[in-house]
Amino acid sequence: MTRPLALIIFLVAILTNTDPSRSDAGSDPVNYLFRGPVTAVAAIAGEGEHAGIKGSLTFLQKSLDGRTVINGTISGLPEGKHGLHIVDSGDMTKGCYITTAKGHLNPFNLSHGAPSDSARHVGDLGNIYADDTGISVINLTDTVISLFPTPAFVIGRILVIHTTYDDLGRGGSPVSKVNGNAGGRLACGIISYV
């Protein structure tokens, strides 16, 4: 038997498993293949004049319909609040610049908002705060983003830290409803499975 044929048979067996004695068996291949928990990481780095910014964020989602917990530390940031967003791109060939990274991840075509808003971009994660030493300790829980293959899937997307704070779509201008007036990009990293 050739390797490709063996692989196809193996995948078909997994996707069609309906053994009633197994609690994880069933007709949903996403739940079967991704039983969770699922973990991911984004290695954050600045460029050019922001090259001193670095850190790492970990993502944990325990089940397909579960919340995603984001933890980590970023150093080298200017003191203050900074918008934190996931953009609809994974292409960093030109770095973190606006010409490379597209707009916020928004598969449902909604306006920009706060993480707690019922209608918002998938990629709207609000603000982080850097203290007077340039360190931001991040502990967030989000109910929208997903590490599982759904429309809110963030694996392979770019996580961006902005120059200024995100007004959460409440700035009263058209730009506020697009990007929260969060300014340019300080640092970024691609979200990848661990």
UniProtKB/Swiss-Prot annotation:
One of its GO terms (molecular function) is protein homodimerization activity. Transmembrane segments: none annotated. Disulfide bonds join 96-188. It comes from the Eukaryota. The keyword Metal-binding applies. Belongs to the Cu-Zn superoxide dismutase family. Its cofactor is Cu cation; Zn(2+). Destroys radicals which are normally produced within the cells and which are toxic to biological systems. This is Superoxide dismutase [Cu-Zn]. Pfam families: Sod_Cu (PF00080). It catalyses: 2 superoxide + 2 H(+) = H2O2 + O2. Its EC number is 1.15.1.1. CDD domains: Cu-Zn_Superoxide_Dismutase. One of its GO terms (biological process) is removal of superoxide radicals. Binds 1 copper ion per subunit. It is an enzyme of class 1 (oxidoreductase). Coiled coil: none annotated.
